[in-house]
């Protein structure tokens, strides 16, 4: 399964032209019903986080928005993150990926980042923290906290990483207006 995921990622890189990560491929190969998949993209270690819904239901909505990563800003976002990392590495050579960057790094050395690179780096730091908090919420069966973190994740994607679209923003805003979601 891991080899299939890695081959699929390489196909995206070489034939599609998108320097994507491996999360989607891993989710397809290793996802199991009733669980979220927490993936460490550095080590490729993963764990399944059981989702106990109780009286809740999980609803997925197809926005009907079609896109290809080659025509989106995906590669540009990768470049912006890599640029931020290269600047921060001047202060801390032990940094390997943006995952290693802490809020302290950003506070102390972020002045040398352009505003866009700073925003992208800040998003990655916060999103990594949210993933861990979301797993803790699932383990504690705290679905309200989990839902709040999902909303925060969307806000970060929309405003800090700038990869959302009007249709998704509309759907998220519509769900927020309901007392039942």
Question: What residue ranges belong to the model's regions?
Answer:
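Gly/Ser-rich oxyanion-binding loop with an adjacent helix/lid
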Residues: 1-50, 177-179
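C-terminal nucleotide
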Residues: 35-181
